[in-house]
């Protein structure tokens, strides 16, 4: 096979899918990945400012807001980073704090999906797509923590913390 110029997925994400006309492609990708219908409202500013000199700079490849007000971070990483899980946690936390105002109730925190496409082994496993989430499991009874009736009412009928 000769030299062919192929478009890499990271190039497409960073350049093509930022256009509103191409949102259907991104919506289809996210809908399949998250197993629910996703409708993108807007592409958000993907670079956060450092508030203090000691803050880490956070830049993601694409940041979108869906019709439910939830945020999806799509990050493409070519270079091996052994502490990439920590980077995911930092990036997600930073986005959460940037989208809630001082004095706003914590119930207004938006759900953030962190979608990471990496071109290296992230860990050891047989699959190539993994879904991680935060669950609270009891130490003694191994039950999954659910919200109380009052908490559920406050959060619009949700039964789980996230």
Regions found by a protein language model. Give the residues of each.
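Elongated, amphipathic alpha-helical interaction scaffolds
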Residues: 1-162
């Amino acid at each position: 096979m000769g030299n062919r110029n192929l478009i890499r997925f990271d190039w497409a994400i960073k350049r093509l899918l930022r256009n509103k006309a191409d949102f259907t492609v991104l919506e289809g990708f996210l809908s399949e990945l998250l197993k629910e219908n996703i409708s993108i409202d807007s592409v958000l500013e993907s670079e956060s400012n450092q508030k203090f000199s000691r803050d880490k700079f956070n830049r993601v490849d694409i940041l979108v807001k869906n019709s439910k007000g939830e945020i999806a971070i799509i990050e493409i990483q070519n270079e091996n980073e052994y502490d990439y899980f920590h980077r995911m946690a930092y990036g997600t936390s930073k986005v959460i704090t940037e989208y809630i105002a001082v004095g706003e109730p914590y119930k207004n925190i938006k759900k953030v999906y962190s979608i990471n496409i990496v071109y290296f082994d992230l860990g050891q496993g047989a699959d190539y797509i993994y879904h991680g989430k935060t669950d609270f499991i009891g130490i003694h009874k191994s039950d999954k923590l659910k919200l109380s009736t009052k908490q559920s009412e406050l959060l619009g009928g949700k039964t789980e913390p996230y």
